[in-house]
Each structure stands twice: as C-alpha cells, then as structure tokens.
Amino acid sequence: MDLTTLRAVLAELRPLLVPARFEKAQQPNPHTLQLGLRGLSGMRWLEISWLAAAPRLLAIDPPPKQGDGSTLARVLQHGLGGLALVAIEQEGFERVVDLHFAPRPGEASGRRLVVELMGRHSNVFLLDAQGRVVSLARQVREQQSRLRPIASGSSYGRPPALQSDPPSLEESQEHWRRRLQLVPVSLRQALQQTYQGISPALALQLVDGAPEPAAELLAQPVGTLSQEHWDHLWARWQRWLHDLEQERFGWEVDDSRSGSGGSSQYRCWGTASSGPVNAPLAAYYRQRLGQGELQRRRASLELKLLAAREREERLRQQQQDLLDQVESGDDLSRQADALLCLAAPSRDQVAEAQALYRRARRLRRSVVSITPRLELHQRQLDRLDASLAFLALHGPELSHGLHHDGDLEEALCQLQALEQESEELLARVGTEGRRSGRRAPPRSAPASTPSPLELLTPGGLRVQVGRNHRQNEWISLRQARRGDLWFHAQECPGSHVMLKASAAEAADADLQLAADLAAHFSRARHNGRVPVLKVPCDQLQRIAGAAAGTVTHKGGEVVWASPQRAAHWLAAAESVPKVPAEPGP
C-alpha cells in the first residue's frame, strides 16, 4: 500500500469511523490485526497488517471469530476497552497513521495506535498517554536496528524523516524539471530520489499514456527525454497533486497491462469518476493473498508427496533386488549338484553342497513374503502418482484465473480436500509394510459431500469430473446409475469422468467431449492424442481392500481423445448447479 492508496483509504474511512467505539480486537494470523469499531452507521471492522509483502490498513467485511486469544489482541482488548476512536491522523507523505482513542469525543487522547506501513519495517504500536509503548506487533532489537530499537516499555520515536522533498503544487514546471535533471540517472530514480511519496507503482502511473511503454520510459536517462515527454509527465504530476489535495479518488483496474511493463494493476487517482476505494481494494488484497496462500500450500504438498514417493520407490527397489536374487537359487543348486557329482567328494565339499542347497531353498521360500511387499509398495506408488497427478492437473486452476471470491473459496476447498487425502495417504505409507502386526491409522470421516466438477455437454447431459480420490469413488460407484458411462485415460493416473447418459441418450459429440475431458484431466494432458477407456458404469467394480477411487472394469472400448480440444471447451463452459445426491445403483 503506497502513500496515494493510503490517503484514498483514510479519506473514505474518516467519515465512517470517527467517532466509533472500540469493541473487539482479534489476530487471525501472526501478521494481521482486526479491530471491531461501532459507529453511528453500525459495526465496522478495520484490518491492519504488517506483512512485509502486503502491509495495509483498510475496512473489511465482518470476519469470522478467530485469534482473540493472542497476546496482542488481549492487550488491545484491555487497553482500548471503553474508549472511542476520535481521530485518524496521517502527516505529509509519511506512511504512518495515528489512531487516537479517548473516553469520548472532544476529550484528550488516552491511547494511540500507531500503524507504520513501510514494507519489511512495518509495525503496529499501542502507546499510552505519555507516548510509551504498551505493546507492539513485533519487537525491534538493537541487532535489527541500531538507529531505532523499540520494545515494550520504551518511549516511541517516529521513523527517520524522509531525505527527499515533499511535492508541492506551488512549484513551477521549470524548477520541477531542473530538479529532476540535476543528476544523470534514469527517470524512475530521479522521481523516487527527488520527491517523497513516489512508489514504483505511482511512477508507472505518472508516465502512463506516453507513446512509449511506461517501463521503457522510466528506464531512460532524464537527459534523453523530449519536450513532449516532459509536458506529458508534468500534466500527470499536476493531476496527481490536485487529486491528493482535494481527496478526489476513485478505482480503476487494468488487467490487460498488469505485469507487462505498463501501469500497476489498479489505481485510485486520475480516474474518470470518483468513487469508493476501500471495498475494491480489500477484494484486491483478498484475491492476491489468497492466490499466494494457494501456491504456497500447493508447493508444500507437492514436496511432501515427492519425498514420500522417493522413499517408497527406494523401498520397492529393495524388495525388487531381493526378488531378483531368487533367480540365483538355481545357480546355487547347480553348484551343489556339481559338488555332489564328484567321484569322491570330501566331507567339506558335502557340507558346502548342503549349505548351497539351504541357501537356494531360503531364496525360493522368500518369494512368498517378498511378492506381497512388492505389490504393496507398487500400490502405494500408484496412489502417490495419482495424488501428484491431481495436484498437477488442478494446479493451474488453483493458482490462476481466480477473479471472484467464489472461485477462490472453491479452489481452497479443492486444495484442502487434496491435503486431507494426502495426509491419510502419507500416514498409510509410513505405517503399512513395516510390521505385519501394525495396523494403518483409520481413515478420518469425510466432513462434507464431495463436490466434483460438474459441466453440461452441448447435448444438455451432465458430466462429472473427479478432482481427488474421494470424488472419483463418489461419482463412479455411489452416484452412478445404470446407463451412465465411465471414462478414464488408459494406463495413466487421472480423473474419473462420468457422463450421465442415464438421463437421455448421449450423442456422439457428448461422448467425444467426455473422452476429451478424461484425457485433459490426466497425466497425459500434454499429448496430442490420448487413448481413453469408455466403460458402462454397471461394469465397474470396487477392488476389495483397495483405497478409495480404485476400481476395476470388465469390457469397455478405447476412444481416442484430444486434451487440447477439452481445454478450449472448458474455457467457455459454465458449471451447473449442484444437485442432491442420488443413491447408487
């Protein structure tokens, strides 16, 4: 959150929150604080975060109750209880906000909550009337900052003053240009080193609309800019300063140019019309932080599964090596036969032959115990490969293209389901096969009804796509009715696809689409053509003792499918509403 965005948020919050009585404090995570304030228009929540990647102060929708037992939340609950927010101050171009609390409006401030939004140096301080630190979000020790160490009980000192000068509407264009050209550096460096409040995002916005791409123009030395460039930049500079002075803010998003060297993805000044900033900004942070959390959790789960697969492959190879040694039993028997076929074998030769026979018998008997262990490790490898395939298939869906809160919540639910299944699988991998007498941990009861991907074919038939092992079993064995068709990529981990042909006769286009979806949601999705099995659901059978989502089939036929064709179709498809669960056949 840069200075311009902070000014826009505070201009919107002051009439809503001043005055407002403090009621609740909670800390949902280690870097975020949420305050409940009751004003004239009702209860409102303020979120303050000192996360280095996304420090922010803004109003949010009522959050769930969580984190009210943290130390910082308890101190704030005790220190601000019975007080009202009477002022919100922010001076100059500093990203420091003072929230003043007093027993009632018009009285002297008894407590101050100071919010510093400065990247990795962001922090939150609760101060008493004398300016001493009662509590703070994170301690700043001398090893971290010799200039400004702060701890509970010490006197609060403001951050060091900014070295550059504050922008001013009274400055002339000639003086402004001369200052920027004083040192032969790039335009970006000149703006940020000469004036306060110029963030990288604001620098991009100031040069937006020039003939050259914004990033290229900012990288040019100031001495090479033309008069046209300076006139355009001066006009944008004046518009920015006027909007700041008059608190004329709005919200605009330009997704087409984000991350491509153009302006930042959103702006809150220079917009076509004025409007609220806080609500869309809160949604923006919610989406970006949610996507980051999804990517981190997905990467962590992938590392766990890969480590478990490597360990399981090593154990399987050990059993395979033991099984390969069984073939040497025949050689041992022949060596023993050769010793006993001597004309006059000695006692030592007879003893050696008997030892060779015993070794050969032990090797042959070991097949009975090695083979089940080898099969067990192979089943575990297949399960791990399937889990990795699910994670890879739905990774792009979990990480990108989430433009609405519903999309983000759905992605979180799908990832959580994969995490729960993987935890059970990893626990089973760590216990099965070590001791025959040890039992695997019981499977946890599912918390809710599975929610597979549901789509409508061009012919109006429903098609269900399992996105984890539990969903695969649910659509293939529990929800399937006589007449439904099951699709799965041949000899390849992936999703079960069920075409609900029991409702109506499936056209050729519907059958081809279901096959394409099965190819797309498989590990062979990058191939040009994929063989897909098409089997009537009444020919599916659960494998006794196997894990969820493991089936065998009789008959069926192979259909050639195109994963790319399914990908193009999915881009325009819409999910159908959920329907009540139907009893299995």
Where are these regions (language model features)?
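Extended, highly charged segments
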Residues: 1-585
